[in-house]
């Protein structure tokens, strides 16, 4: 009888431990499921964009996405670019010395560019068309929002119902698409665009004026993008689409 009682007690204890382990395992599985659901429900809107996210573009990252070229350059701070469908992109940046990036084409051309800036917050210096040529090496801007004047005023050019001021300046031993170099900047500034509406930029008008009045010609097309640039310890965000 003692032997049977001992076996009964052992059996009861083993059964109790097994049941306890099953309960703990089940609770852990449920907790894990709830955690995943919570993460999915609170994911930032920017993370719902599909495509590549570059967390640390320094000094420059480039690539292609959905048939478009993209570029992101950064000095200091932090910055990332995220891609949506077609020509959509979003850039977030914090405490940057300089950041310039966006989406477009490589090579560029004298095309008619459409764009829509859906969201823009924080501090920035420029939003518009940005690109480069080689032979000669030229960095060019068409400022739809913000201001990139500075240097020598050349003339005014009319395009898309607006008057742009053309400024030209020389950069000496500065970062470029071929490394540190000396090159000219061509900068057309209007600055009157706004968020949430479809706009267009006829690059033929700008390029013809640069070629005829810039004094350096225009060179061979390198990349050409709808871009944001911010410098001077700025932070902000843009979500825009180009076509």
Model-identified regions with their sequence ranges:
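Extracellular-facing/secreted segment signature in eukaryotic proteins
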Residues: 65-69, 73-86, 157-172, 188, ...
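Long, compositionally biased interface segments
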Residues: 199-243
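An exposed acidic His-Trp-rich patch
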Residues: 136-196
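Bacterial Sec-dependent N-terminal signal peptides
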Residues: 1-5, 26-53
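Bacterial N-terminal signal peptides that target proteins for export
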Residues: 3-19
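Short N-terminal edge-element motif at the start of the domain
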Residues: 52-123
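Extracellular-facing segments of soluble proteins and assemblies that are Gly/Ser/Thr-biased and enriched
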Residues: 98-159
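Bacterial N-terminal signal peptides
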Residues: 16-28
């Amino acid at each position: 009888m003692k032997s049977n009682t001992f076996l009964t007690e052992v059996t009861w204890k083993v059964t109790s431990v097994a049941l306890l382990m099953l309960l703990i395992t089940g609770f852990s599985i449920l907790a894990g499921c709830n955690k995943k659901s919570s993460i999915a429900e609170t994911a930032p809107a920017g993370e719902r964009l599909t495509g590549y996210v570059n967390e640390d573009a320094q000094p420059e990252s480039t690539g292609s996405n959905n048939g478009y070229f993209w570029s992101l350059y950064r000095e200091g701070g932090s910055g990332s670019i995220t891609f949506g469908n077609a020509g959509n992109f979003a850039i977030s940046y914090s405490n940057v010395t300089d950041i310039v990036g966006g989406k477009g084409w490589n090579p560029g051309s004298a095309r008619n560019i459409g764009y829509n800036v859906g969201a823009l917050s924080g501090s920035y210096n420029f939003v518009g068309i940005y690109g480069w040529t080689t032979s000669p090496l030229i960095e060019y801007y068409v400022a739809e929002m913000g201001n990139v004047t500075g240097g020598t005023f050349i003339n005014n050019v009319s395009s898309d119902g607006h008057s742009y001021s053309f400024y030209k300046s020389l950069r000496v031993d500065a970062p470029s698409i071929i490394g540190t170099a000396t090159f000219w900047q061509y900068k057309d500034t209007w600055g009157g665009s706004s968020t949430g509406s479809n706009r267009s930029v006829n690059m033929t008008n700008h390029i013809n004026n640069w070629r005829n009045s810039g004094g350096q010609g225009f060179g061979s097309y390198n990349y050409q993008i709808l871009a944001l640039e911010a410098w001077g310890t700025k932070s902000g965000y843009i979500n825009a689409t180009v076509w």
